[in-house]
């Protein structure tokens, strides 16, 4: 018989840096999950992606066991890394803060493909380009 799901927790945590402090502790503690077990497992799975924020979906079962799925980093984080900037523009329609090439956008779209609701890489690219536009990043050919 399948285990009964009692909770679904979604968090965005720095790769390899999960600890029992907020936001992880309180979110999992209210479901009775062993927080240290989650932190160790999450840090082990994400240690090679240091510096990125990795979203995670934790499914909590009736017997207090859990499983989790790590997603790809948000497009905005990948765009900031590609453009070497710390934050997007405060006024994206007026102030442009950086440029990213089409090839970089394609790489990001291919990375994000499994988490995006897109049928093709081109559709995923247009989603990433939209995120870039809303951050004040211009897309250049190349």
From Swiss-Prot:
Domain of life: Bacteria
Cellular compartments per GO CC: cytosolic large ribosomal subunit
Keyword set includes RNA-binding: yes
GO molecular function: large ribosomal subunit rRNA binding; structural constituent of ribosome
Keywords recorded for this protein, A-Z: Methylation, Ribonucleoprotein, Ribosomal protein, RNA-binding, rRNA-binding
Subunit-structure text: Part of the ribosomal stalk of the 50S ribosomal subunit. Interacts with L10 and the large rRNA to form the base of the stalk. L10 forms an elongated spine to which L12 dimers bind in a sequential fashion forming a multimeric L10(L12)X complex.
Role according to the record: Forms part of the ribosomal stalk which helps the ribosome interact with GTP-bound translation factors.
Protein name: Large ribosomal subunit protein uL11
Organism in which the protein naturally occurs: Desulfitobacterium hafniense (strain Y51)
Gene transcribed to yield this protein: rplK
